């Protein structure tokens, strides 16, 4: 549990930092491109961008540390590259069944799945995309992260790619389930939906 809290607390500063930047950039783009202002879409996009910033802080942004000379990038650390599919997944299930340890299951196994559910949920929510496009978005982002981690003090594991993609699919299933019940509300978040309010000139 402490490791989960540490990851979440590490995400928050980056999510807070990106918020004003996103708002400023978005306002400029809306003005320059004369876009219709849709509060539903903008709020959804705001949350999605904040999530991406938090995800990046735990995956591709090098760890930072405060020292006497200020903030420094921590380049030292553990590196691991695992390219055998399902190896980590099998180890996780072994730990659960044989050793009755759920640590890897909760933090790494389920964490990798839950962490990518927003891709499967927000991509079709905010843009008119097919199921394949939404799934491919999560897969490509995960692939980019795993390749990037080869050059960072982080771990690269092909099972992460598998679990991340599974999480994207689950997020997509959640979106489709909610849309089947709240179609009118969910469609308001997409580009091209009637503007909820005219953007002030």
Predicted regions and their residues:
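Loop-to-transmembrane alpha-helix initiation sites
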Residues: 156-157, 161-162
């Amino acid at each position: 549990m402490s490791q989960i809290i540490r990851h979440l607390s590490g995400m928050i500063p980056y999510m807070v930092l990106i918020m004003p930047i996103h708002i400023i950039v978005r306002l400029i783009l809306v003005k320059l491109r004369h876009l219709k202002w849709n509060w539903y879409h903008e709020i959804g996009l705001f949350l999605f961008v904040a999530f991406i910033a938090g995800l990046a802080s735990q995956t591709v942004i090098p760890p930072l540390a405060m020292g006497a000379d200020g903030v420094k990038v921590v380049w030292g650390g553990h590196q691991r590259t695992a390219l055998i599919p399902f190896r980590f997944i099998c180890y996780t299930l072994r730990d659960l069944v044989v050793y009755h340890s759920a640590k890897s299951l909760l933090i790494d196994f389920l964490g990798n799945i839950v962490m990518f559910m927003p891709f499967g949920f927000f991509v079709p929510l905010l843009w008119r995309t097919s199921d394949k496009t939404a799934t491919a978005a999560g897969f490509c982002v995960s692939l980019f992260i795993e390749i990037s981690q080869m050059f960072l003090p982080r771990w690269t594991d092909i099972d992460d790619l598998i679990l991340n993609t599974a999480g994207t699919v689950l997020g997509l299933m959640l979106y489709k389930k909610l849309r089947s019940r709240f179609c009118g509300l969910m469609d308001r978040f997409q580009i091209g939906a009637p503007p909820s309010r005219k953007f002030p000139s």
